[in-house]
Amino acid sequence: MGMRMMFTLFLLVVLTTTVVSYPSDSASDGRDDEAKDERSDMYELKRNGRCCHPACGKHFNCGR
């Protein structure tokens, strides 16, 4: 393959992955909400003096 053909193939792959991944961003809104809920649960456990998340588990008892 020549350089021009390889460059064209590279652009085709990049554009295809960009177009394919763009619509899937709208589906992640629900997953983001779930992640926010998990974070709020972590902070609630932290306020109660226990936390099993690695970010705060070293400072608090896991409570298991």
Swiss-Prot record:
GO terms for molecular function: acetylcholine receptor inhibitor activity; ion channel regulator activity; toxin activity. Residues 1-21 form the signal peptide. InterPro entries: Conotoxin_a-typ. It is found in: Secreted. It comes from Conus achatinus (Little frog cone). The cysteine framework is I (CC-C-C). Alpha3/5 pattern. It holds the Pfam family Toxin_8. Its main location: secreted. Keywords: Acetylcholine receptor inhibiting toxin, Amidation, Cleavage on pair of basic residues, Disulfide bond, Ion channel impairing toxin, Neurotoxin, Postsynaptic neurotoxin, Secreted, Signal, Toxin. This is Alpha-conotoxin-like Ac1.1a. Belongs to the conotoxin A superfamily. Expressed by the venom duct. Disulfide bonds join 51-56, 52-62. The modification Cysteine amide is found at residue 62.
